[in-house]
Structures are given as C-alpha cells and as structure tokens.
C-alpha cells in the first residue's frame, strides 16, 4: 500500500476525530480468532466520516475494505495490506416503525431477530443463529433453513466506492 496515501488517510482520520489502529492483528477482530495485521483499522462514528474516509482513500490510491463483526472472515497470517473500515457499535442501531425494522450495517443479525420477536414481526426466523452483521448479511445474501436476506430486505442505503450515498430498493437495482 502506498505509504504517502496511508499517511494522508491517517491525517484525515485524526482531523475528523476518527479512531484508528495501525498494524492491528486481525485475529482480535474475527470470530475465528485468526489473521495477521491490517495496515490500518478505521473506526468511523458517523456516515460523514465514512464518506470522507472513502473519498480520501480513493483520492490517495489506498485499498479500502469494510468489515462488520468479523464473522465468516478468514484472514491470512500475513495480514491485510489495506485500510479496513470497521462497522461496529457506532453503526448498530435497530429501530422499528410499524411493521418495518431499520438496522444499521454493524447491527448483529441476532439483535435484529430479537427485535423482530419483541415486536411480533415475522420473516427473519431463518436468520436467528447466523453470526454476523446486517451489512455483511445483506452484502452476501446470508441465509439458512430456506430463507435468505433477499426475501426480507426491502431497501438498503449504502456508500459506494466514490463515497456517494445511494439506495438499492429491489434486486433490479443491483443487476
């Protein structure tokens, strides 16, 4: 990874008050407890920080990856030569409006399933027990017992590789 670009990214993170760790062992951030160091782990607290970090990484040719709670993630002992955005507790809100659940990318599927149960909402039964975050589950179309995220996901707000916010509202939006 380009050293000057990483320095620019870290300077931007510092300036906006975004926590980060350099050369952090990924084994501390994966459910399998394996993995060498990531060049930089970034812990944004707001969507604005995510947007700014994505734009800065792109402008400085820094490879950027995104993770949730590190489930279903195998990292080599050699580590990751990239900056890694971590969608953690700062993006774990789950709310209910009517018969719709709104969950941020870092919210665990278990938390979303419990929220559905507490509000007598059905459709997520298949997801109970899947370790992972909502963002990762939506990205990979997680599923079990005949159900998949595509069956229950109505809309997804995302930030693309250019740092622009957008929404996907149906399968045709992805194709």
Regions found by a protein language model. Give the residues of each.
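A short, flexible low-complexity segment enriched in Lys/Arg and Gly/Pro that occurs
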Residues: 37-56, 100-121
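Structural motif
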Residues: 39-41, 62-65, 72-73, 81-85, ...
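A gly/ser-rich beta-alpha-beta helix-loop segment of oxidoreductase catalytic cores
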Residues: 110-119, 123-154, 160
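Structural signature of FAD isoalloxazine-binding scaffolds in flavoprotein oxidoreductases
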Residues: 35, 42-47, 74-92, 139-169
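N-terminal, positively charged, Ser/Thr/Ala/Gly-biased leader segments
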Residues: 1-67
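General beta-strand structural signal in soluble alpha/beta enzymes
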Residues: 21-23, 65-68, 75, 96, ...
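Conserved small/polar residues in nucleotide/adenosyl-binding loops
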Residues: 174-175
């Amino acid at each position: 990874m380009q050293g000057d670009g990483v320095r620019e990214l870290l300077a931007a993170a510092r300036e906006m008050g975004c926590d980060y760790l350099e050369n952090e062992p990924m084994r501390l951030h994966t459910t399998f407890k394996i993995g060498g160091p990531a060049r930089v782990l970034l812990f944004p607290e707001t969507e604005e920080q995510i947007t700014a970090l994505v734009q800065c990484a792109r402008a400085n040719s820094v490879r950027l990856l995104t993770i949730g709670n590190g489930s279903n993630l195998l990292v080599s002992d050699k580590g990751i030569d990239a900056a890694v955005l971590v969608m953690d507790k700062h993006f774990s809100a789950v709310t209910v409006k009517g018969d719709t659940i709104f969950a941020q990318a870092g919210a665990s599927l278990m938390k979303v399933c419990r929220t559905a149960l507490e509000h007598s909402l059905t459709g997520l039964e298949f997801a109970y027990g899947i370790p992972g975050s909502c963002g990762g589950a939506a990205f990979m179309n997680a599923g079990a017992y005949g159900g998949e995220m595509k069956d229950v996901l109505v809309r997804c707000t995302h930030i693309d590789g250019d740092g622009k916010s957008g929404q996907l509202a149906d399968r045709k939006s992805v194709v």
